[in-house]
Structure formats: C-alpha cells, structure tokens
Amino acid sequence: MPVYRNPCISAIFVKLMPYGNGPGVKYPDRIGSNMPLATRLTCRKGTSMSEKSGPQSIPAATVVVFRRAANGGPAQVLMLERASTMRFAGGAAVFPGGRIDPSDHELAMQLSHGFDNDEAAARIAALRETIEEAGLVLGMNVRVTPDQAAEARGMLAGHGALAPVLERFGWVPDLSTLHPWSRWCPDWKGAFDTCFYLADLGTGAVEVSKDDTENTHLFWASAREAIAMSERGEISVIFPTLRNLERLALHDSFAEARDFAARFPIRTVVPFRSEVDGEDYLTLPNDLGYPVTSQSFKTIRRG
C-alpha cells in the first residue's frame, strides 16, 4: 500500500480532499533538479501532447475509456491485466495502450484531423491499441457492430496497421473524441513517453474481450473501486497507473474528468526522487492536479 504523505488523504475518500502535496516533501525543481539536465530537457520540453519524445524514450499512447455505471454510481473505466510474461508491467492492471508505430504517423499524414501529425499519431495509436487489446472500436464515424470489431481486431493482428482496417469498413476516425489527460516520461533510458487520453462510451453497451497474448483479463471498475482492489491485493498497479487512478477518483463522470484536465496545460510528468525523514520517495510536482504526490520506494511497483 502506498505511504501517503498527507495523513488526511485516503485513496478511497480522495474525492473529499483537495489535490496537493502533504508536508515534508521538498521540491528542488518543478520537475526535479536531481536528474541529469539532458534528461530534464528531453522529457520536459513544452506543454503539448505532441512535443517530440527524446531520443532515449519510446513514444506511447494510452486511453482511459469511461462508461456510465448501471447503478448510477461513479463512472467506470476499462482496465486490463497484462500477461505475467510481458516484459513491461507483467501481471499489472493498466489502461489500454501501447507504442506509437510508424504506421500511425503514416496514417496521420493521410487523414484530415486538425491536429499536428505527432498529436494525431498518438491518438491513432490509442485507438488502434484499444482495438488490439480489448476488441473495442472507439471514435469512428458510424456505429460499429461486434462482428466488425472482431474482424478489425483480427486484421490488426495480421497487418498491425489501422489504415487497412479503416479502408475495409469505410470508417473515418474522429480524433477529437479523445481528450488529453496527462503525459508521463520517467527519467531513464528506454522509458515510455506516454500520452494519456480520455474517451467516453456513454452507456458502455459494447463487447470487450481479452486478447490472450498481451492481457489475460479485462474489467470495468470506478477509479475508487480499482484503488480499493489494489489496496486489498486483488490487482497489482504500477506507480503511474495508481497516481492517475487517484486523480480520476476525484470525479464521478467523464465530463467532470475532462473539464478538470482542461484546467491543467499538458506538462510532461517526470517523477523524481525525494527524501523524507531519511526515506526515499518517488515524487511528483504538486501543481498538476494529483491528490497523492509521493510514495515510498519500499512500496512502489514501477513496471
């Protein structure tokens, strides 16, 4: 279980608390001056989701998919448990997502979307990975049937690119249906520089299924429910996922989360090391809307 620096904050009741940081954590820099300058410049440039990744990082995209809860409670989000054999975050519960491929950039140059090509490629990757990992087609111009979604998933397994799928079904993606949430880039070589997006399914009356290769289980839960599952040891959650679940738990609906995110210009989150009472913590800047901003290295799962 994380060690929360503000003793008033509970992961389950985080909605009741203002976001911010507890006492005792010192910030040497807005992002962290204890990391090499070159790394800070690589991962911290600008405030856009479309800023280019540094040469040592791997561009990636992920999407938090919302649906309304049948019981009228807080909205649920789609999570998947990665196969234990996966090199990154094996066995962990994560949001759908993955690397931004060259084919995503190629498609971005072909579509009319109103974004710069890097931003469009990230959004295309988020849509593609959600089909691959969950069999869920988001953001298209027409209603997609379960049979079409299954065929699209099969095509991606064979081709690996979204363009042939769009051509096969006559789909046109609306990239504006994805809303920026955050961007994370840890400060080590080969880290994923990940753009996080939000998407809304409304009632969520769709079929999703595991792919039996990269993931072994899919489930819907509110952010607060997912945090509780982690605290009970029912799921394993890595540091970035947990921090974003806590931020999502501040909100009962997709609209609330979307509007909240719009208050914070996208600035790359680079966790940094801090020391509190002789103990090392992994820490976030305290001005990005995260209600819990530090966790002891002793309790962190990093991926």
What role is predicted for each listed range?
Residues N21, K26, P36-G303:
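N-terminal leader/linker segments that precede catalytic domains of diphosphate-processing enzymes
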